[in-house]
A protein has these predicted regions:
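Active-site beta->alpha N-cap acidic-glycine motif
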Residues: 21-110, 121, 125, 134-135, ...
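A cross-domain feature marking catalytic cores of carbohydrate-active enzymes
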Residues: 47, 74-76, 98-100, 140-142, ...
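A short acidic, amphipathic alpha-helical/loop segment
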Residues: 58-59, 84-88, 148-152, 204-208
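CE4/NodB-like, metal-dependent polysaccharide N-deacetylase domain
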Residues: 60-73, 94-95, 112-144, 151, ...
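Non-membrane alpha-helical structural segments and their capping/turn regions in soluble enzymes
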Residues: 112-117, 176, 199-202
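His/Asp/Glu-enriched short active-site or ligand-binding loop at hydrolase and phosphoryl-transfer sites
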Residues: 144-146, 150-185, 217-228
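Catalytic grooves of carbohydrate-active enzymes
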Residues: 186-224
Length: 230
């Protein structure tokens, strides 16, 4: 009996640790903003892993059409490769957030020192691209957090941004299914995660925006709503 209890207890601990690391909204290891603290019909759009030289301009056109501001979490290397496009993002009222320099799949396994270097290198590329007004918003690759990341972010001044609606647009290939998945989950204060490198991304964004606006929702830029300054 003791052995069985021990097994179940051990399994529970493992399950909790996995939940704490892989669900960015848990806040166990790193304090995050994964939902806006409001009951009003307010939403925030975020985009990861861009900018993409073909897809991101289409998304920007849609956002401009509906006067929606968003946050783009871009790896530093992508910023360096697409400096003019990154400047367009900023010039049209959006914000560039830190998403590490290389967005490595191994990032969660780095030492805290190496994590900090990745984060700092990304910020330096943001500044080098002439984007000094970028706020200190950070989103870890894949949304994975752990004690090492907490140490790397200590005294960094970053606000860590998560999400409570994950579009799964990198997995689901049918835009209709993605739109349905997102719109069914929209609630006051939702932070929505998209990626700006899928060929149907602009179509999805427009449908979601139209759905939300028809129901009285307003889109806000995270740093402005939260009162976060550089």
């Amino acid at each position: 009996m003791i052995t069985v209890i021990g097994i179940f207890s051990g399994a529970s601990v493992v399950a909790f640790l996995v939940y704490a690391s892989f669900y960015i909204g848990s806040g166990v290891y790193v304090k995050t903003v994964s939902r806006l603290p409001t009951d009003k019909k307010i939403l925030a759009l975020t985009f990861d892993d861009g900018p993409h030289h073909e897809i991101t301009p289409l998304i920007l056109d849609v956002l401009k059409k509906y006067h929606v501001e968003a946050v783009f979490f871009c790896p530093g290397e992508n910023i360096e490769k697409n400096t003019l496009l990154t400047r367009r993002i900023m010039n049209e009222g959006h914000l560039i957030g830190n998403h590490t320099n290389r967005h490595s799949a191994l990032f969660p396994f780095y030492s805290s020192k190496r994590m900090k270097t990745e984060i700092d290198d990304s910020w330096n590329r943001i500044v080098s691209a002439g984007l000094p007004d970028s706020s200190r918003l950070f989103r870890p690759p894949f949304g994975i957090t752990n004690p090492t990341l907490r140490k790397a972010l200590r005294n960094s001044g970053y606000t860590v941004i998560g999400w409570n609606i994950r579009s799964l647009d990198t997995i689901i290939k049918d835009p209709v299914v993605v739109v349905r998945r997102v719109t069914r989950r929209i609630r006051p204060g939702s932070i929505i995660l998209f990626h700006d490198f899928n060929y149907y991304a602009a179509e999805i964004i427009e449908r979601v925006i139209i759905y939300a606006l028809k129901r009285g929702y307003v889109f806000v830029r995270l740093d402005k709503y939260l009162g976060i300054r550089n």
